[in-house]
């Protein structure tokens, strides 16, 4: 378990059943690790980040088109351990603002995964079979 911002613990989970209760999780996802946390020390806004494994032939169907070049900033308190550590290896990724990462690349929408209240976010293809998705409320 990692220590998140504002003294909260962040655990990485691989419970797909629990993840399905929070977001739309396509049947093509074979495994996932995920974590959640607050966006600020006060208020009710929060985020969910997930690294998902998908068969290579099914991954393109999960990427909302079109991709736009951009930079994804990991949410405050997200712990870059377990499968999340692979974000550090994305070309151009760099640490910013303490525990956060800035990760450049083609960013996709999160329409295939969005479920109220998690309606904002980005998806980033990490490899031929791996996808990083971050969603947040607001």
PLM region spans:
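Short, exposed beta-strand-loop hairpins at the edges of beta-sheets
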Residues: 114-128, 134-135
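N-terminal low-complexity, Pro/Thr/Ser-rich intrinsically disordered segments
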Residues: 1-27
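Mature extracytoplasmic domains of secretory-pathway proteins
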Residues: 26-102
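Short, low-complexity intrinsically disordered segments
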Residues: 4, 44-45, 134
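Short, extreme N-terminal segment that most often corresponds to the first beta-strand
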Residues: 8, 52, 130-138
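Short N-terminal helix-initiation segments at or just after the protein's N-terminus
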Residues: 1, 69-74, 127-136
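Short secondary-structure capping micro-motifs at structural edges
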Residues: 17-21, 33-40, 119-120
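Short, solvent-exposed secondary-structure boundary motifs
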Residues: 23-26, 97-117
């Amino acid at each position: 378990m990692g220590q998140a911002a504002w003294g909260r613990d962040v655990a990485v989970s691989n419970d797909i059943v629990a993840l399905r209760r929070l977001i739309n999780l396509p049947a093509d996802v074979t495994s996932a690790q995920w974590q959640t946390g607050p966006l600020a020390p006060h208020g009710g806004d929060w985020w969910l980040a997930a690294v998902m494994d998908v068969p290579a032939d099914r991954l393109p169907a999960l990427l909302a088109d079109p991709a736009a070049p951009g930079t994804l900033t990991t949410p405050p308190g997200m712990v870059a351990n377990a499968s999340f550590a692979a974000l550090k290896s994305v070309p151009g990724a760099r640490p910013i603002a303490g525990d956060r990462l800035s990760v450049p690349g083609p960013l996709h929408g999160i329409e295939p995964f969005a479920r109220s209240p998690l309606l904002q976010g980005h998806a980033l293809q990490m490899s031929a079979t791996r996808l990083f998705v971050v969603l947040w409320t607001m």
